[in-house]
Swiss-Prot record:
<dbReference type="GO" id="GO:0004345">
    <property type="term" value="F:glucose-6-phosphate dehydrogenase activity"/>
</dbReference>
<feature type="binding site">
    <location>
        <position position="352"/>
    </location>
    <ligand>
        <name>substrate</name>
    </ligand>
</feature>
<dbReference type="InterPro" id="IPR022675">
    <property type="entry name" value="G6P_DH_C"/>
</dbReference>
<dbReference type="InterPro" id="IPR022674">
    <property type="entry name" value="G6P_DH_NAD-bd"/>
</dbReference>
<keyword id="KW-0560">Oxidoreductase</keyword>
<feature type="binding site">
    <location>
        <position position="160"/>
    </location>
    <ligand>
        <name>NADP(+)</name>
    </ligand>
</feature>
<comment type="function">
    <text>Catalyzes the oxidation of glucose 6-phosphate to 6-phosphogluconolactone.</text>
</comment>
<feature type="binding site">
    <location>
        <position position="228"/>
    </location>
    <ligand>
        <name>substrate</name>
    </ligand>
</feature>
<feature type="binding site">
    <location>
        <position position="194"/>
    </location>
    <ligand>
        <name>substrate</name>
    </ligand>
</feature>
<keyword id="KW-0119">Carbohydrate metabolism</keyword>
<dbReference type="Pfam" id="PF00479">
    <property type="entry name" value="G6PD_N"/>
</dbReference>
<dbReference type="GO" id="GO:0050661">
    <property type="term" value="F:NADP binding"/>
</dbReference>
<comment type="similarity">
    <text>Belongs to the glucose-6-phosphate dehydrogenase family.</text>
</comment>
<dbReference type="GO" id="GO:0009051">
    <property type="term" value="P:pentose-phosphate shunt, oxidative branch"/>
</dbReference>
<feature type="active site" description="Proton acceptor">
    <location>
        <position position="252"/>
    </location>
</feature>
<protein>
    <recommendedName>
        <fullName>Glucose-6-phosphate 1-dehydrogenase</fullName>
        <ecNumber>1.1.1.49</ecNumber>
    </recommendedName>
</protein>
<feature type="binding site">
    <location>
        <position position="190"/>
    </location>
    <ligand>
        <name>substrate</name>
    </ligand>
</feature>
Amino acid sequence: MGKISGSGTVAPHILVIFGASGDLAARKLIPSLWDLFEQELLPRTFGILGAGRTALSTESFRARLAEAVTKHAVRTPHDPARLTEFLQKIHYFSFDPTDSVAFADFATYVRTLDQSLHTEGNFIFYLATPPSLYETIPTQLAMHHLNREQGNFRRVVIEKPFGYNLETAQHLNASLRAHFQENQTYRIDHYLGKETVQNILVTRFANPLFEPTWNRTHIDYVEITASESLGVENRGGYYDQSGALRDMIQNHLLLLLGIIAMEAPAVVSSSRLRDEIVKVFDCLRPMGERDVMQHTVRAQYVAGKIRGVAVPGYLEESGVDPRSCTETFAALKCYIDNWRWMDVPFYLRTGKRLPTGVTEVIVHYRTLPIALFEHIERPCAREGNALVIRIQPDEGIQLKIDLKEPGAGFKTIPVSVDFQYSALTYSHLPSAYERLLLDCMNGDNTLYHRDDAVESAWRFIDPILAAWKSNKSPLLTYPAGSWGPKAADDLIKGSAPRWHHPSSTLLSDDFACRL
Protein backbone atom coordinates (compact mmCIF):
# COMPACT_ATOMS: atom_id res chain seq x y z
CA MET A 1 0.00 0.00 0.00
CA GLY A 2 1.26 3.46 -0.86
CA LYS A 3 2.94 5.45 1.86
CA ILE A 4 3.93 9.08 1.85
CA SER A 5 6.97 10.38 3.65
CA GLY A 6 7.13 13.61 5.57
CA SER A 7 9.73 16.25 4.86
CA GLY A 8 10.79 16.17 8.50
CA THR A 9 9.60 15.58 12.03
CA VAL A 10 6.22 17.22 12.53
CA ALA A 11 6.16 19.53 15.55
CA PRO A 12 3.53 19.03 18.26
CA HIS A 13 0.35 20.96 17.45
CA ILE A 14 -3.43 21.10 17.53
CA LEU A 15 -5.38 20.96 14.28
CA VAL A 16 -8.59 22.95 14.72
CA ILE A 17 -11.29 22.12 12.16
CA PHE A 18 -14.04 24.72 11.86
CA GLY A 19 -17.15 23.15 10.36
CA ALA A 20 -16.10 19.81 11.82
CA SER A 21 -19.63 18.39 11.87
CA GLY A 22 -19.88 18.81 8.09
CA ASP A 23 -19.36 16.52 5.12
CA LEU A 24 -15.77 17.51 4.26
CA ALA A 25 -14.45 16.66 7.72
CA ALA A 26 -16.23 13.30 7.79
CA ARG A 27 -15.39 12.18 4.24
CA LYS A 28 -11.93 13.65 3.71
CA LEU A 29 -10.16 15.32 6.63
CA ILE A 30 -10.59 12.88 9.51
CA PRO A 31 -10.06 9.76 7.33
CA SER A 32 -6.88 11.33 5.93
CA LEU A 33 -5.66 12.15 9.43
CA TRP A 34 -6.31 8.53 10.41
CA ASP A 35 -4.26 7.37 7.41
CA LEU A 36 -1.38 9.64 8.51
CA PHE A 37 -1.73 8.31 12.06
CA GLU A 38 -1.58 4.71 10.81
CA GLN A 39 1.65 5.50 8.95
CA GLU A 40 3.06 7.07 12.15
CA LEU A 41 3.50 10.41 10.39
CA LEU A 42 1.71 12.44 13.07
CA PRO A 43 3.58 13.64 16.15
CA ARG A 44 2.97 11.81 19.40
CA THR A 45 1.93 15.13 20.95
CA PHE A 46 -0.98 16.03 18.74
CA GLY A 47 -4.64 16.93 19.02
CA ILE A 48 -7.67 17.47 16.78
CA LEU A 49 -10.28 19.98 17.87
CA GLY A 50 -13.55 19.97 15.99
CA ALA A 51 -15.52 23.22 16.16
CA GLY A 52 -19.01 23.77 14.86
CA ARG A 53 -22.51 25.02 15.51
CA THR A 54 -23.95 21.51 15.87
CA ALA A 55 -24.49 20.67 19.53
CA LEU A 56 -22.39 17.56 20.17
CA SER A 57 -20.40 16.14 23.04
CA THR A 58 -16.84 15.03 22.44
CA GLU A 59 -17.91 11.40 22.89
CA SER A 60 -20.74 11.61 20.36
CA PHE A 61 -18.42 13.41 17.93
CA ARG A 62 -15.84 10.64 18.28
CA ALA A 63 -18.53 8.03 17.61
CA ARG A 64 -19.48 9.82 14.39
CA LEU A 65 -15.89 9.95 13.26
CA ALA A 66 -15.22 6.29 14.05
CA GLU A 67 -17.89 5.46 11.48
CA ALA A 68 -16.43 7.97 9.01
CA VAL A 69 -12.94 6.49 9.32
CA THR A 70 -14.23 2.96 8.80
CA LYS A 71 -16.19 4.04 5.72
CA HIS A 72 -13.85 6.50 4.00
CA ALA A 73 -10.22 5.90 5.04
CA VAL A 74 -7.77 4.34 2.59
CA ARG A 75 -6.47 2.14 5.41
CA THR A 76 -9.45 0.36 6.92
CA PRO A 77 -9.08 0.11 10.72
CA HIS A 78 -8.49 -3.51 11.78
CA ASP A 79 -7.25 -2.96 15.33
CA PRO A 80 -9.97 -1.50 17.61
CA ALA A 81 -7.37 -0.43 20.17
CA ARG A 82 -5.46 1.52 17.53
CA LEU A 83 -8.63 3.28 16.38
CA THR A 84 -9.49 4.12 19.98
CA GLU A 85 -6.01 5.60 20.45
CA PHE A 86 -6.62 7.86 17.45
CA LEU A 87 -10.11 8.88 18.56
CA GLN A 88 -8.79 9.87 22.00
CA LYS A 89 -6.88 12.67 20.28
CA ILE A 90 -10.14 14.22 19.04
CA HIS A 91 -12.13 16.85 20.95
CA TYR A 92 -15.18 18.96 20.13
CA PHE A 93 -16.34 22.47 21.00
CA SER A 94 -19.79 23.70 19.99
CA PHE A 95 -20.22 27.44 19.35
CA ASP A 96 -21.20 30.10 16.82
CA PRO A 97 -17.98 31.59 15.34
CA THR A 98 -19.77 34.83 14.46
CA ASP A 99 -20.48 35.48 18.16
CA SER A 100 -17.52 37.37 19.70
CA VAL A 101 -18.41 36.33 23.25
CA ALA A 102 -18.66 32.68 22.24
CA PHE A 103 -15.38 32.99 20.33
CA ALA A 104 -13.68 34.28 23.50
CA ASP A 105 -14.82 31.11 25.29
CA PHE A 106 -13.52 29.05 22.38
CA ALA A 107 -10.13 30.81 22.52
CA THR A 108 -9.87 30.05 26.23
CA TYR A 109 -10.70 26.40 25.58
CA VAL A 110 -8.08 26.17 22.81
CA ARG A 111 -5.36 27.53 25.10
CA THR A 112 -6.40 25.20 27.93
CA LEU A 113 -6.32 22.22 25.58
CA ASP A 114 -2.90 23.29 24.31
CA GLN A 115 -1.54 23.35 27.86
CA SER A 116 -3.02 19.96 28.73
CA LEU A 117 -1.71 18.32 25.54
CA HIS A 118 1.69 20.11 25.67
CA THR A 119 1.44 21.15 22.01
CA GLU A 120 3.65 24.22 22.56
CA GLY A 121 1.17 26.82 21.28
CA ASN A 122 1.26 25.48 17.70
CA PHE A 123 -2.08 25.64 15.87
CA ILE A 124 -3.44 24.93 12.40
CA PHE A 125 -6.90 26.39 11.80
CA TYR A 126 -8.73 24.60 9.00
CA LEU A 127 -11.80 26.40 7.60
CA ALA A 128 -14.09 23.59 6.36
CA THR A 129 -16.93 26.11 6.42
CA PRO A 130 -19.11 28.06 4.00
CA PRO A 131 -17.16 30.85 2.24
CA SER A 132 -19.21 33.44 4.15
CA LEU A 133 -17.00 32.68 7.19
CA TYR A 134 -13.63 32.98 5.42
CA GLU A 135 -13.25 36.57 6.57
CA THR A 136 -15.04 36.28 9.92
CA ILE A 137 -13.04 33.42 11.44
CA PRO A 138 -9.51 34.76 10.70
CA THR A 139 -10.61 38.16 12.03
CA GLN A 140 -11.90 36.57 15.23
CA LEU A 141 -8.71 34.52 15.58
CA ALA A 142 -6.70 37.74 15.36
CA MET A 143 -8.95 39.53 17.86
CA HIS A 144 -8.17 36.78 20.37
CA HIS A 145 -4.43 36.73 19.51
CA LEU A 146 -4.50 33.23 18.03
CA ASN A 147 -2.74 34.43 14.87
CA ARG A 148 0.49 35.60 16.50
CA GLU A 149 3.62 33.50 16.10
CA GLN A 150 6.05 33.84 18.99
CA GLY A 151 8.49 30.98 18.55
CA ASN A 152 5.59 28.74 17.54
CA PHE A 153 3.41 28.48 14.43
CA ARG A 154 -0.13 29.57 13.63
CA ARG A 155 -1.48 28.60 10.19
CA VAL A 156 -4.85 28.98 8.51
CA VAL A 157 -6.12 26.67 5.75
CA ILE A 158 -8.90 27.87 3.44
CA GLU A 159 -10.92 25.70 1.06
CA LYS A 160 -12.19 26.76 -2.35
CA PRO A 161 -14.00 28.75 -3.58
CA PHE A 162 -11.58 31.57 -2.83
CA GLY A 163 -13.71 34.49 -3.86
CA TYR A 164 -16.65 34.77 -6.24
CA ASN A 165 -14.80 37.00 -8.73
CA LEU A 166 -11.62 39.09 -8.86
CA GLU A 167 -12.99 41.83 -6.62
CA THR A 168 -14.09 39.47 -3.84
CA ALA A 169 -10.84 37.48 -4.08
CA GLN A 170 -8.80 40.67 -3.71
CA HIS A 171 -10.94 41.74 -0.76
CA LEU A 172 -10.50 38.36 0.94
CA ASN A 173 -6.74 38.41 0.33
CA ALA A 174 -6.53 41.89 1.85
CA SER A 175 -8.53 40.77 4.87
CA LEU A 176 -6.28 37.76 5.41
CA ARG A 177 -3.11 39.83 5.01
CA ALA A 178 -4.35 42.12 7.78
CA HIS A 179 -4.16 39.20 10.22
CA PHE A 180 -1.90 36.47 8.78
CA GLN A 181 1.33 36.57 6.80
CA GLU A 182 1.30 34.92 3.37
CA ASN A 183 3.50 32.11 4.71
CA GLN A 184 0.85 31.42 7.35
CA THR A 185 -1.95 31.18 4.77
CA TYR A 186 -2.68 27.92 2.96
CA ARG A 187 -5.27 28.09 0.15
CA ILE A 188 -5.99 24.45 -0.54
CA ASP A 189 -6.83 22.87 -3.90
CA HIS A 190 -6.99 19.10 -3.49
CA TYR A 191 -6.02 18.60 -7.15
CA LEU A 192 -2.49 19.71 -6.26
CA GLY A 193 -2.33 16.91 -3.71
CA LYS A 194 -2.94 14.21 -6.30
CA GLU A 195 0.09 12.08 -7.14
CA THR A 196 -0.71 12.19 -10.84
CA VAL A 197 -0.78 16.00 -10.90
CA GLN A 198 2.59 16.18 -9.18
CA ASN A 199 3.87 13.53 -11.58
CA ILE A 200 3.27 15.89 -14.51
CA LEU A 201 6.25 17.91 -13.26
CA VAL A 202 8.43 14.80 -13.08
CA THR A 203 7.25 13.53 -16.48
CA ARG A 204 8.16 16.86 -18.05
CA PHE A 205 11.36 17.82 -16.31
CA ALA A 206 12.99 14.45 -15.53
CA ASN A 207 12.65 12.89 -18.98
CA PRO A 208 14.62 14.16 -21.98
CA LEU A 209 12.13 12.25 -24.13
CA PHE A 210 9.48 14.92 -23.47
CA GLU A 211 10.95 18.27 -22.46
CA PRO A 212 12.77 19.06 -25.75
CA THR A 213 9.48 18.62 -27.65
CA TRP A 214 7.24 20.34 -25.07
CA ASN A 215 6.60 23.48 -27.12
CA ARG A 216 4.73 25.06 -30.03
CA THR A 217 7.07 23.50 -32.60
CA HIS A 218 6.03 19.94 -31.74
CA ILE A 219 2.70 20.20 -29.89
CA ASP A 220 -0.43 20.87 -31.92
CA TYR A 221 -2.99 21.39 -29.15
CA VAL A 222 -3.80 20.34 -25.58
CA GLU A 223 -7.08 19.08 -24.10
CA ILE A 224 -7.89 19.21 -20.39
CA THR A 225 -11.11 17.45 -19.38
CA ALA A 226 -12.75 17.04 -15.98
CA SER A 227 -16.01 15.17 -16.51
CA GLU A 228 -18.48 14.05 -13.87
CA SER A 229 -21.31 11.55 -14.24
CA LEU A 230 -22.93 12.82 -11.05
CA GLY A 231 -25.31 15.74 -10.88
CA VAL A 232 -25.29 18.40 -8.17
CA GLU A 233 -26.30 15.83 -5.54
CA ASN A 234 -27.12 17.63 -2.27
CA ARG A 235 -25.21 20.80 -3.29
CA GLY A 236 -27.91 22.35 -5.47
CA GLY A 237 -28.11 25.57 -3.47
CA TYR A 238 -24.33 26.11 -3.53
CA TYR A 239 -23.83 25.04 -7.12
CA ASP A 240 -26.60 27.27 -8.42
CA GLN A 241 -24.64 30.28 -7.13
CA SER A 242 -21.40 29.00 -8.62
CA GLY A 243 -21.59 27.06 -11.89
CA ALA A 244 -19.04 25.00 -13.79
CA LEU A 245 -16.74 27.91 -14.69
CA ARG A 246 -16.27 29.03 -11.08
CA ASP A 247 -16.48 25.57 -9.51
CA MET A 248 -13.98 23.76 -11.74
CA ILE A 249 -12.24 25.84 -14.40
CA GLN A 250 -11.17 28.86 -12.33
CA ASN A 251 -9.24 26.61 -9.95
CA HIS A 252 -8.74 22.95 -10.89
CA LEU A 253 -8.45 23.16 -14.68
CA LEU A 254 -6.45 26.38 -14.78
CA LEU A 255 -4.11 24.79 -12.24
CA LEU A 256 -3.58 21.81 -14.55
CA LEU A 257 -3.00 24.20 -17.45
CA GLY A 258 -0.42 26.07 -15.37
CA ILE A 259 1.52 22.89 -14.56
CA ILE A 260 1.38 21.64 -18.15
CA ALA A 261 2.55 24.98 -19.57
CA MET A 262 4.98 26.31 -16.94
CA GLU A 263 8.69 26.80 -17.50
CA ALA A 264 11.16 24.71 -15.53
CA PRO A 265 11.98 26.38 -12.20
CA ALA A 266 15.63 26.96 -11.39
CA VAL A 267 15.17 24.79 -8.29
CA VAL A 268 12.26 22.77 -6.94
CA SER A 269 11.13 25.10 -4.19
CA SER A 270 7.82 26.49 -3.04
CA SER A 271 8.38 30.02 -4.30
CA ARG A 272 9.99 29.06 -7.63
CA LEU A 273 7.30 26.54 -8.59
CA ARG A 274 4.50 28.93 -7.74
CA ASP A 275 6.26 31.79 -9.55
CA GLU A 276 6.22 29.78 -12.78
CA ILE A 277 2.52 28.91 -12.49
CA VAL A 278 1.64 32.57 -11.95
CA LYS A 279 3.66 33.50 -15.04
CA VAL A 280 1.49 31.16 -17.11
CA PHE A 281 -1.72 32.68 -15.72
CA ASP A 282 -0.41 36.17 -16.47
CA CYS A 283 0.27 35.14 -20.09
CA LEU A 284 -3.25 33.84 -20.75
CA ARG A 285 -4.65 35.79 -23.68
CA PRO A 286 -7.51 38.00 -22.36
CA MET A 287 -10.95 37.42 -23.83
CA GLY A 288 -13.13 40.24 -25.06
CA GLU A 289 -16.84 39.81 -25.75
CA ARG A 290 -16.20 38.62 -29.31
CA ASP A 291 -13.65 36.07 -28.07
CA VAL A 292 -16.15 34.79 -25.51
CA MET A 293 -18.73 34.31 -28.27
CA GLN A 294 -16.26 32.39 -30.45
CA HIS A 295 -14.15 30.52 -27.91
CA THR A 296 -16.49 29.50 -25.08
CA VAL A 297 -19.49 27.21 -24.71
CA ARG A 298 -21.83 27.01 -21.74
CA ALA A 299 -24.71 24.61 -21.29
CA GLN A 300 -27.06 23.04 -18.76
CA TYR A 301 -28.08 19.38 -18.60
CA VAL A 302 -31.66 18.28 -19.14
CA ALA A 303 -33.21 14.92 -18.27
CA GLY A 304 -31.51 11.88 -19.75
CA LYS A 305 -29.93 8.55 -18.81
CA ILE A 306 -26.64 7.69 -17.12
CA ARG A 307 -25.66 4.07 -17.80
CA GLY A 308 -29.29 3.26 -18.57
CA VAL A 309 -30.74 4.92 -15.46
CA ALA A 310 -33.06 7.89 -15.95
CA VAL A 311 -31.92 11.07 -14.19
CA PRO A 312 -33.64 14.47 -13.88
CA GLY A 313 -32.55 17.68 -15.54
CA TYR A 314 -30.68 20.37 -13.64
CA LEU A 315 -33.76 22.55 -13.16
CA GLU A 316 -35.52 19.64 -11.43
CA GLU A 317 -32.70 19.14 -8.91
CA SER A 318 -33.30 19.92 -5.23
CA GLY A 319 -32.19 23.41 -4.21
CA VAL A 320 -31.94 24.69 -7.79
CA ASP A 321 -33.96 27.71 -8.93
CA PRO A 322 -36.33 26.39 -11.66
CA ARG A 323 -35.50 29.51 -13.70
CA SER A 324 -31.74 29.15 -13.19
CA CYS A 325 -29.31 30.11 -15.95
CA THR A 326 -26.35 28.48 -14.17
CA GLU A 327 -24.12 26.43 -16.46
CA THR A 328 -23.36 22.80 -15.62
CA PHE A 329 -21.05 22.45 -18.64
CA ALA A 330 -18.31 24.82 -19.75
CA ALA A 331 -15.73 24.60 -22.50
CA LEU A 332 -13.04 27.14 -23.40
CA LYS A 333 -10.47 27.57 -26.12
CA CYS A 334 -7.62 29.65 -24.74
CA TYR A 335 -4.10 30.68 -25.65
CA ILE A 336 -0.90 31.39 -23.73
CA ASP A 337 0.96 34.31 -25.25
CA ASN A 338 4.57 33.44 -24.55
CA TRP A 339 7.55 32.13 -26.50
CA ARG A 340 6.86 28.44 -25.76
CA TRP A 341 3.12 28.31 -26.45
CA MET A 342 2.17 31.13 -28.82
CA ASP A 343 -0.89 30.12 -30.92
CA VAL A 344 -1.14 26.60 -29.46
CA PRO A 345 -4.80 26.18 -28.43
CA PHE A 346 -5.60 24.80 -24.99
CA TYR A 347 -9.10 23.33 -24.76
CA LEU A 348 -10.63 23.15 -21.29
CA ARG A 349 -13.85 21.22 -20.67
CA THR A 350 -15.86 20.29 -17.61
CA GLY A 351 -19.41 19.19 -17.01
CA LYS A 352 -21.84 17.32 -14.84
CA ARG A 353 -23.99 14.37 -15.94
CA LEU A 354 -21.50 13.37 -18.64
CA PRO A 355 -21.10 9.66 -19.51
CA THR A 356 -18.27 8.97 -17.07
CA GLY A 357 -16.26 10.66 -14.33
CA VAL A 358 -12.68 11.26 -15.51
CA THR A 359 -10.01 13.94 -15.24
CA GLU A 360 -7.21 13.83 -17.78
CA VAL A 361 -4.83 15.89 -19.90
CA ILE A 362 -4.16 14.98 -23.53
CA VAL A 363 -1.14 16.49 -25.26
CA HIS A 364 -1.51 16.12 -29.04
CA TYR A 365 1.66 16.22 -31.10
CA ARG A 366 1.85 17.66 -34.58
CA THR A 367 1.69 15.31 -37.56
CA LEU A 368 4.67 14.82 -39.82
CA PRO A 369 4.80 17.04 -42.92
CA ILE A 370 4.77 14.01 -45.24
CA ALA A 371 2.86 10.75 -44.62
CA LEU A 372 5.16 7.98 -45.87
CA PHE A 373 2.97 5.11 -44.77
CA GLU A 374 -0.63 4.18 -45.41
CA HIS A 375 -2.76 4.71 -42.35
CA ILE A 376 -5.61 2.34 -41.56
CA GLU A 377 -8.70 4.39 -40.85
CA ARG A 378 -10.26 3.50 -37.52
CA PRO A 379 -13.49 5.14 -36.28
CA CYS A 380 -11.83 6.30 -33.07
CA ALA A 381 -8.22 6.72 -34.12
CA ARG A 382 -6.64 10.16 -34.02
CA GLU A 383 -4.04 11.47 -36.39
CA GLY A 384 -0.69 12.06 -34.76
CA ASN A 385 0.85 10.97 -31.48
CA ALA A 386 -0.66 11.85 -28.13
CA LEU A 387 0.30 11.70 -24.47
CA VAL A 388 -2.63 10.98 -22.15
CA ILE A 389 -2.10 11.86 -18.49
CA ARG A 390 -4.90 10.31 -16.45
CA ILE A 391 -5.43 12.22 -13.19
CA GLN A 392 -8.34 10.11 -11.94
CA PRO A 393 -9.55 7.36 -11.84
CA ASP A 394 -7.27 4.50 -13.00
CA GLU A 395 -4.33 6.87 -12.69
CA GLY A 396 -1.54 6.55 -15.20
CA ILE A 397 0.08 7.70 -18.44
CA GLN A 398 -0.54 6.48 -21.98
CA LEU A 399 1.62 7.33 -25.00
CA LYS A 400 -0.19 6.82 -28.30
CA ILE A 401 1.93 6.08 -31.34
CA ASP A 402 1.61 4.40 -34.75
CA LEU A 403 3.30 1.07 -35.56
CA LYS A 404 3.31 -1.21 -38.58
CA GLU A 405 0.44 -3.66 -38.85
CA PRO A 406 1.75 -7.24 -39.17
CA GLY A 407 1.73 -8.54 -42.72
CA ALA A 408 2.56 -7.26 -46.16
CA GLY A 409 2.96 -3.59 -46.87
CA PHE A 410 3.50 -0.66 -44.54
CA LYS A 411 0.07 0.00 -43.14
CA THR A 412 0.17 1.58 -39.70
CA ILE A 413 -2.07 1.00 -36.72
CA PRO A 414 -2.45 3.06 -33.55
CA VAL A 415 -1.08 1.43 -30.41
CA SER A 416 -0.36 2.65 -26.90
CA VAL A 417 2.47 2.39 -24.41
CA ASP A 418 0.96 2.44 -20.94
CA PHE A 419 1.89 2.97 -17.31
CA GLN A 420 -0.65 2.55 -14.52
CA TYR A 421 -0.08 3.30 -10.86
CA SER A 422 -2.03 0.15 -10.01
CA ALA A 423 0.83 -1.87 -11.53
CA LEU A 424 3.21 -0.73 -8.79
CA THR A 425 3.86 -2.90 -5.76
CA TYR A 426 1.29 -1.11 -3.61
CA SER A 427 -2.41 -1.03 -4.29
CA HIS A 428 -3.51 2.42 -3.16
CA LEU A 429 -2.24 5.91 -3.85
CA PRO A 430 -2.14 8.27 -0.87
CA SER A 431 -5.13 10.57 -0.87
CA ALA A 432 -4.70 14.20 -1.86
CA TYR A 433 -5.68 15.40 1.60
CA GLU A 434 -3.09 13.13 3.24
CA ARG A 435 -0.32 14.84 1.31
CA LEU A 436 -1.65 18.37 1.71
CA LEU A 437 -2.36 18.07 5.43
CA LEU A 438 1.11 16.68 6.08
CA ASP A 439 2.69 19.45 4.00
CA CYS A 440 0.85 22.08 6.03
CA MET A 441 1.99 20.44 9.27
CA ASN A 442 5.56 20.65 7.98
CA GLY A 443 5.16 24.29 6.93
CA ASP A 444 5.53 23.42 3.23
CA ASN A 445 3.13 25.49 1.10
CA THR A 446 4.47 24.38 -2.31
CA LEU A 447 1.21 22.64 -3.22
CA TYR A 448 -1.04 25.46 -2.00
CA HIS A 449 -2.23 28.48 -3.98
CA ARG A 450 -0.54 31.83 -3.47
CA ASP A 451 -2.52 35.08 -3.35
CA ASP A 452 -1.27 36.37 -6.71
CA ALA A 453 -2.10 33.07 -8.45
CA VAL A 454 -5.69 33.22 -7.23
CA GLU A 455 -6.10 36.81 -8.41
CA SER A 456 -4.45 36.14 -11.78
CA ALA A 457 -6.82 33.22 -12.43
CA TRP A 458 -9.84 35.38 -11.59
CA ARG A 459 -8.48 38.14 -13.83
CA PHE A 460 -8.74 35.74 -16.78
CA ILE A 461 -12.15 34.33 -15.79
CA ASP A 462 -13.97 37.57 -14.92
CA PRO A 463 -14.50 38.83 -18.51
CA ILE A 464 -15.99 35.46 -19.47
CA LEU A 465 -18.41 35.62 -16.55
CA ALA A 466 -19.39 39.17 -17.48
CA ALA A 467 -20.03 38.26 -21.12
CA TRP A 468 -22.08 35.23 -20.11
CA LYS A 469 -24.11 37.34 -17.72
CA SER A 470 -25.00 39.69 -20.59
CA ASN A 471 -25.87 36.68 -22.79
CA LYS A 472 -23.04 37.23 -25.28
CA SER A 473 -22.75 33.43 -25.36
CA PRO A 474 -26.08 31.54 -25.28
CA LEU A 475 -26.92 29.02 -22.56
CA LEU A 476 -27.36 25.73 -24.43
CA THR A 477 -28.70 22.40 -23.20
CA TYR A 478 -27.48 18.81 -23.44
CA PRO A 479 -29.07 15.50 -22.41
CA ALA A 480 -27.69 13.90 -19.27
CA GLY A 481 -25.46 11.02 -20.37
CA SER A 482 -24.11 12.83 -23.44
CA TRP A 483 -20.75 14.57 -23.91
CA GLY A 484 -22.33 18.01 -23.93
CA PRO A 485 -23.79 20.22 -26.66
CA LYS A 486 -22.78 20.02 -30.32
CA ALA A 487 -21.29 23.50 -30.00
CA ALA A 488 -18.52 22.01 -27.83
CA ASP A 489 -17.43 19.77 -30.72
CA ASP A 490 -17.63 22.76 -33.05
CA LEU A 491 -15.28 24.60 -30.68
CA ILE A 492 -12.49 22.07 -31.14
CA LYS A 493 -12.98 21.45 -34.87
CA GLY A 494 -10.16 23.77 -35.79
CA SER A 495 -7.82 21.20 -34.22
CA ALA A 496 -9.65 17.85 -34.35
CA PRO A 497 -12.93 16.26 -35.50
CA ARG A 498 -14.08 16.00 -31.89
CA TRP A 499 -12.93 15.93 -28.31
CA HIS A 500 -11.03 12.96 -26.92
CA HIS A 501 -13.74 11.01 -25.10
CA PRO A 502 -12.26 9.35 -22.02
CA SER A 503 -13.16 5.89 -20.81
CA SER A 504 -13.56 4.89 -17.19
CA THR A 505 -10.40 2.81 -17.63
CA LEU A 506 -7.18 4.14 -19.10
CA LEU A 507 -6.37 1.13 -21.30
CA SER A 508 -9.68 1.39 -23.19
CA ASP A 509 -9.36 5.14 -23.54
CA ASP A 510 -10.75 6.65 -26.76
CA PHE A 511 -9.23 4.26 -29.31
CA ALA A 512 -11.63 1.57 -28.11
CA CYS A 513 -14.50 4.09 -27.87
CA ARG A 514 -15.83 2.51 -24.69
CA LEU A 515 -17.46 4.56 -21.94
